[in-house]
């Protein structure tokens, strides 16, 4: 019954859509009901009615199965038989077309010179009496289940360990399987003698005066501010190029001599050699040439041509070479070829 009513509703809806609408292009005035009367605003679009069966799939308004009839065939509807456009050609073959087809087979039959694997005839004396393809009988095999002799060595859980050595000392932590017997709360006896490290005070006054700040227990006794006791000069103290100055005795008396010449004056000492950066180099060849390039690996080749020592030599592209022509020869009476003049 429900299907019949649904069909009747569809027929009524189609009939209403096919009828021409009255007062569709006019604006109605006054009170109008919302349903089932038409809207007062004219419109040209056709109302699409979606059946209730299409609204069940996640609020989708699109039809699940699109059934639109048109003249275009769908995929798989073609029945095309591909035939060659050439029917009466001498070069037509199953493998394609070519200019001069060959009727011979491309690869001939391969005939092996050796016999096949099943073509051998084995002599009866070499053939085995036992067919190894069949399973072996149980008579020539060891029994699968047999009693194994018990070993005299006890199993890991068959020992009777002494309870006294494995007794738990306290209940603070769990007892391990291989527990150490060394007690964790070992306190050395006072009869052992010396104090423990860090429990005694070293008298530093016997070695050197103890400073006022804190020091470590095992302090190094090496002095940090020792003065050198060596008499020899240290590194950088002497000049190897310096000559030893020998005091010369003056042969002139201190008193004034009665002569007309003065005392000879000693030569002035040599000035010290200049160090790096103290030279003042003077360029007497003129101002330096400033190169255009300023790269890190600048070329050392000069950009200005230098005058050659032989000015009479021709430069490049000054030669005019001439291509030599063909030279004719004459055969003389002495059977020799002589160039013609």
From Swiss-Prot:
The keyword Cell cycle does not apply. Belongs to the STPG1 family. Coiled coil: none annotated. It is found in: Cytoplasm; Nucleus. Keywords: Apoptosis, Cytoplasm, Nucleus, Phosphoprotein, Repeat. It comes from the Eukaryota. The modification Phosphotyrosine is found at residue 78. GO terms for biological process: positive regulation of apoptotic process; positive regulation of mitochondrial membrane permeability involved in apoptotic process. GO terms for cellular component: mitochondrion; nucleus. This is O(6)-methylguanine-induced apoptosis 2. The keyword Phosphoprotein applies. May positively contribute to the induction of apoptosis triggered by O(6)-methylguanine. It comes from Mus musculus.
């Amino acid at each position: 019954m429900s299907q019949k009513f649904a069909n009747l509703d569809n027929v009524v809806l189609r009939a209403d859509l096919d009828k021409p609408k009255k007062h569709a292009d006019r604006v109605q005035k006054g009170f109008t009901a919302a349903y089932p009367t038409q809207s007062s605003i004219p419109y040209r679009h056709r109302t699409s009615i979606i059946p209730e069966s299409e609204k069940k799939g996640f609020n989708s308004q699109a039809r699940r199965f699109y059934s639109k009839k048109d003249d275009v065939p769908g995929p798989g509807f073609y029945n095309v038989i591909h035939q060659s456009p050439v029917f009466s050609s001498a070069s037509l073959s199953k493998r394609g077309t070519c200019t001069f087809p060959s009727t011979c087979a491309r690869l001939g039959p391969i005939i092996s010179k050796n016999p096949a694997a099943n073509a051998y005839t084995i002599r009866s004396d070499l053939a085995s009496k036992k067919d190894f393809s069949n399973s072996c009988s149980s008579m020539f095999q060891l029994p699968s289940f047999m009693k194994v002799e018990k070993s005299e060595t006890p199993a890991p859980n068959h020992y009777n360990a002494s309870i006294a050595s494995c007794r738990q000392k306290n209940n603070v932590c769990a007892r391990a399987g291989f527990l150490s017997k060394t007690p964790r709360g070992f306190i050395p006896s006072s009869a052992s003698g010396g104090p423990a490290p860090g429990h005694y005070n070293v008298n530093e006054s016997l070695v050197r005066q103890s400073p006022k700040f804190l020091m470590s227990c095992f302090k190094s006794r090496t002095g940090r501010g020792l003065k050198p006791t060596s008499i020899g000069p240290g590194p950088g103290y002497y000049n190897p190029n310096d000559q030893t100055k020998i005091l010369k005795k003056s042969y002139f008396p201190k008193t004034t001599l009665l002569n007309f010449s003065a005392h000879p004056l000693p030569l002035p000492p040599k000035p010290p050699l200049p160090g790096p950066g103290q030279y003042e180099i003077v360029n007497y060849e003129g101002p330096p040439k400033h190169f255009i390039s300023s790269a890190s690996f600048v070329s050392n080749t000069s950009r200005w041509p230098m005058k050659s020592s032989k000015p009479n030599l021709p430069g490049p592209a000054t030669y005019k070479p001439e291509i030599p022509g063909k030279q004719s020869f004459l055969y003389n009476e002495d059977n020799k070829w002589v160039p013609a003049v």
